[in-house]
Amino acid sequence: MLCEQISEYVDVSREIVKVMVSDSAAGALKKSLDRQEAMIDSLLDTEVQASQLIRDLMAVEEKVAQKLLDTEETKQKSSSKLQKIDRELQERMEKNASLESSIKFLQKDLEELKVMEEEIADMQREADEDTTTVIPSAVYLAKLFHNVTKIDWDYNCDPSLIKGIHYGGDIAQPISIDSNQHSKIFICNYLWSLLSTDW
C-alpha cells in the first residue's frame, strides 16, 4: 500500500512539472496541487498508523517474551518441587521399608515371647501341681520317716557327710558318716540297726 502511494505521489509530481512546462490552465494546476496535498496527508496518516502498528507489535512481543520468561520460571519451580517431592517419596519409601522390617522383627520377638509365656505357664502349672501334690506328699513321707527312724537330719552339712541325731534310745546318739569312706550298703545297714524292732 505504501509503495502504491509513493508511486502515485511521483506521478502527481510529474504531472505538476508537465503543467508548469506546458503553460496549462491554472485550474489544472490547482487540481494537481490538491491531489498532491491529499496524497501527502494520506502518506502522513499511513506513517502514523505504521508507527502505531510497530509500537503495538513491540508491546505484544514484550508481553510474549515476559510470558515466556514467567513460563520458564514456573517450569523451573515446578521441576524443583517435583524433584523435592520425589526425594521425599524415596525417603518415605525407605523409611517404610525399614518400619516393615522392624515390624517383622517385633512380630518374631512377640511370637517368641508367646512361646516363652506358654512354657512359663506350663512350668507354673507343674509347680502348682508340685505344690498341691508332690510337696505335701514329700512332707508326709519325711514326717513318717522321722517318726519311724527318730532321726533329725542335718541338711546344712557337707554333701559327702551324713549327719543327724538319733532319738530312738534312752540317750540321743549323734550320727556322722563319711559317704566317701563307707559303702552305701554299710551306711544302709548301720542306719537300719538304729531302728527299734519293738512295736
Swiss-Prot record:
Transmembrane segments: none annotated. Its main location: nucleus. CDD domains: RWD_Spc24. It comes from Xenopus laevis (African clawed frog). This is Kinetochore protein Spc24. It is found in: Nucleus; Chromosome, Centromere, Kinetochore. Pfam families: Spc24. The lineage of its organism: Eukaryota, Metazoa, Chordata, Craniata, Vertebrata. Acts as a component of the essential kinetochore-associated NDC80 complex, which is required for chromosome segregation and spindle checkpoint activity. Required for kinetochore integrity and the organization of stable microtubule binding sites in the outer plate of the kinetochore. The NDC80 complex synergistically enhances the affinity of the SKA1 complex for microtubules and may allow the NDC80 complex to track depolymerizing microtubules. One of its GO terms (molecular function) is microtubule binding. Keywords: Cell cycle, Cell division, Centromere, Chromosome, Coiled coil, Kinetochore, Mitosis, Nucleus. InterPro entries: Ndc80_Spc24. One of its GO terms (cellular component) is nucleus. Belongs to the SPC24 family. One of its GO terms (biological process) is cell division. The gene is spc24. Gene3D superfamilies: Ncd80 complex, Spc24 subunit. Component of the NDC80 complex, which is composed of ndc80, cdca1, spbc24 and spbc25. The NDC80 complex interacts with mis12 and zwint. Residues 45-134 form a coiled coil.
